[in-house]
Amino acid sequence: MSIKLENISYVYSPGTAYEHHALKNVSLEIPQGQFVGIIGHTGSGKSTLIQHLNGLMKATSGKLLYEGQNIYEDGYDMKKLRTQVGLVFQYPEYQLCEVDVLSDVCFGPQNQGLSKEECEKQAREALKLVGFPEKYYKQSPFELSGGQKRRVAIAGILAMHPKVLVLDEPTAGLDPKGRDEILDQVKLLHEKTGMTVILVSHSMEDVAKYVERLIVMNDGEKMLDGTPEEVFRHYKELEAVGLAAPQVTYVMHDLKEKGFDVSADATTVEEAADEIYNFLKKRQEVQS
């Protein structure tokens, strides 16, 4: 099972003075079970792109295939698609609406026509998946911290049992602790369930640590696509379009240029520390 885009283009306000080409012939395939990051500066097209994945926006031209079927064909079941491809918008906590946490997470399954017992079962499973404490299930969602609200909102999507989870800037507005907790939980969720996770972010540091594949959007086009290590090798090209690679990328490239025998492909502080430690250890062994 996969999501496949074939030459997807999208134009806002076509034929008017406000015409804007938000997506330009974007082609890519996301296999089932992959953890993908989509990154780009404001206006790059990344948010427009993900809203095509569950049919919230319809491409001006091109095809979008989910599980081999073109979602733009007449009679395609869009309702089913939107339950299988769950989209969590920026600041999803603004959509919380029920009197307590458990009721809020039950909202999606209820709209799928499930019984009260089934709704509650799936809601509890979803809250457990995002690491939300059971003692708060009957608390008003509006009394929670920002990070807790974000978890509840994500659980509300998971309760509908999607096969694909799309997260648009899931850490926006959170402090560093809340940001790390959410991303750690998303990574754990991916490892536990094997579901496809698509993470949209503007932070290279975030995506470098968590995703296995990185897609860079620029001016409505797919600019780069590969592993984080492959993408960050193009750090000068990223700089040219207003994006910065993780700080460790610059440090490791500087060390390599100065003659240190280290890999410049480290994408996290931990990887860089290991690389430097191994280099120093080898040098010490040679000197002794």
At which residue positions do the language-model features occur?
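ABC ATPase NBD Q-loop/coupling interface
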Residues: 63-80
